[in-house]
Amino acid sequence: MTSSDSHRSAPSPEHGTASTIEILPVAGLPEFRPGDDLSAALAAAAPWLRDGDVVVVTSKVVSKCEGRLVPAPEDTRGRNELRRKLINDETIRVLARKGRTLIIENGLGLVQAAAGVDGSNVGRGELALLPVNPDASAAVLRIGLRAMLGVNVAVVITDTMGRAWRNGQTDVAIGAAGLAVLHNYSGAVDRYGNELVVTEIAVADEVAAATDLVKGKLTAMPVAVVRGLSPTDDGSTAQHLLRNGPDDLFWLGTTEALELGRQQAQLLRRSVRQFSDEPIAAELIETAVAEALTAPAPHHTRPVRFVWLQTPAVRTRLLDRMADKWRLDLASDALPADAIAQRVARGQILYDAPEVIIPFMVPDGAHAYPDAARASAEHTMFIVAVGAAVQALLVALAVRGLGSCWIGSTIFADDLVRAELELPADWEPLGAIAIGYAHEPTDLREPVRVADLLLRK
């Protein structure tokens, strides 16, 4: 058992006290400088500390004592330039920006404006960085107070930051030792018999915010003590308050999330060959088709028609006839029966997919030319336009969470497809698109290395 283990207490079923809590200022503290002994200064200023008190310290004081002050020019321009450099140095990733304001994640995992780089309550020739490890700083301060005063206290180190959804800033815990930073009510039942399913209270943040009412910002009162809370030490730290990575539903600001979505839209599309049975809302496909039809087309024409095979019997009959034709074609190539069966089986995806759409090129509005060369070029131009619309449809489906796979089979049976679907003779089928929710989650595609695929002249 470690020394810290011996001071841990059993968890309480309730984080609130239902009784009086006091918040006491710690007066008489000096102006701290690098190398100062914070524990000794607090012990001298607050010899009245008791077991169970929570000592709440503004992070700026800790930064000063730990030498996290950076010399800065006193002129506004130079000071601001250094501040921007320090913010960049402390930044792990940018979540959002508005004007010159940056909301970032720093090396501690904290998400806040300006990475915690601060020019308040320090000399004009300095800027302050956050403590390197606020949880460790809290633990050291707790041990120091125990050694000097013989008391078992909890310690919370705070910083000021804004909140999503709400105006204004509040103090939160960025370092903690000696108290349960979270209190989970999951499974508890209120007096009406309702189970509290997801309620988890950020106790350390509540303590931090409460003491700011005493500490303030201009009072030169960087430390306050909460008395009457009787905290439970479960070994947790302020790091347990951070929600990072996939658990964070607000990982980016709105503008940045939209930008990332635009950048990733193309990479979301990949060929999905196994689908779940989940039904697809018709509006999703209709909206995706509407977007796909904005693809570029020659002469302001509409050279694309999408035929949605919604009637099961129509789809099955068409696919059966295409499979028969495919077998005959392969047999005429003298392929063995097992090879033919294997090739034909690739078309099973069009039977199994929840939805199938066939894209057609229609030559409405195509220019007529007397020579074969220009007529062929005009035809190619219309084919390319359909290809653009097909790709646009696949991407539009992907951004709605729908998987798809383009299959070229109808191109090899154009007359048969037109006859089965009773379509005009100049409509050219250009494959088929299987659509559905992917059976397994899919990742973003990796961009292809350009290398010799992009030529420069």
UniProtKB/Swiss-Prot annotation:
Annotated keywords: GTP-binding, Ligase, Magnesium, Manganese, Metal-binding, Multifunctional enzyme, Nucleotide-binding, Oxidoreductase, Potassium
Spans annotated as Dehydro-coenzyme F420-0 reductase: 254-457
Record's cofactor remark: Binds 2 divalent metal cations per subunit. The ions could be magnesium and/or manganese.
Binding site for a divalent metal cation 2: 160
Associated pathway: Cofactor biosynthesis; coenzyme F420 biosynthesis
List of residues binding a divalent metal cation 1: 118, 159
Binding locations of GTP: 29-32, 59, 64, 121
Names of required cofactors: Mg(2+); Mn(2+); K(+)
Binding locations of coenzyme F420-(gamma-Glu)n: 329
Pfam family, one: F420_ligase
Family: In the N-terminal section; belongs to the CofE family.
Protein name: Bifunctional F420 biosynthesis protein FbiB
Organism in which the protein naturally occurs: Mycobacterium leprae (strain TN)
